[in-house]
Amino acid sequence: MSPAALRLSSRMSSQFTIEQIREAAQSASVAGIIHAQIETKLERRTRELKPFLELTVRDLTGSLVVRVWQDHPCFAFCGELPAGACIALEGEFVLGTTFGLEPKNWSIRSLNSEERQVLFTGSPESQELQQRAYAEIERTVAAIADPRLRRVSELFLDEFGERFRRAAGARSVHHARRGGLVQHVAQMLKTATALTSVYSYLNRDLLLAGVLFHDAGKLWENAFPKEGFQMPYDLLGELVGHITIGAELVNRLWTKMRREPIYESWKNVKPESELVRWHLLHLVAAHHGEKQFGSPVEPKTPEAIALHFIDNLDAKLEIMTGAYRTGHRLSADIIERVRPLPGHLVEPLPVYVQGEESQS
């Protein structure tokens, strides 16, 4: 194959994330470049038994399926690309009725080492967003008054912060992306802080620590590798699930905290340290709300109830905002149902802006 067939076209195209392409393509075709990693490569055949390739490519924001037909100039080149390869894909992206979002008149090349590093760390904008979210978590942990809950939270961030930063909030549905768990937890901490100012009887320190630890088991169940967007299946996560792992992690870090000299100075602090640990374990165990949804026990304290609904609220709103951006529109104001939401979505009412009243 000639190098010209593999070279990106000379036209000037902007670089986008897959989510940006998907959102813009809702209304018109989009010419642009995406940098992504090949998640899977499947060899398939048409009804006429002609071979074609089906590449699933992924970046920090989402995934896209690229079908490489036998007569495409890049068919042979794509056939040599392994799963895990990092590529630049340039073309016109359109939202079709048969295959959904797909590129037309496209070309492809491998990323160089610098581009590959940026792909996994994200653009400066996405890095700043992630750094702000993690800084919010650190600030909130530092403000926890109960020394036991603050210290066990600090131990978690110290030991598992790097893994935390690349974990997803879920394998699908909500915050299902590299770094999604940090964004989920940071947003939940803001909500929990606001809620405790309204319901003053809530134990603020316990609720904040519960938010931090509620999905800590997903550092194993939903962890991405250091370089990659393909989430592997973890044996421990599959065998026991993130709730059990999270509870075990709390116990492990609490045991580590007990060995520190400062722990002895807390022996007369009320409430007793063991009772604090039990309540934190309850929040982790009960945060799914009902046994049918995976919790071994249902919420039995105000903080456990609050955590369950804060978690559910953030997940549902994340799903909805994503659907408003990229969901299939049945009309200008109605978006097709996205599970697990109960039905079609309706475009939200715009916020009233003073001074924009009709002059008629």
Q: What is each PLM-predicted segment?
A:
Residues 2-38:
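OB-fold nucleic-acid-binding modules
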Residues 54-59, 224:
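Short, acidic/hydrophobic/Gly-rich beta-strand patch recurrent on exposed beta strands
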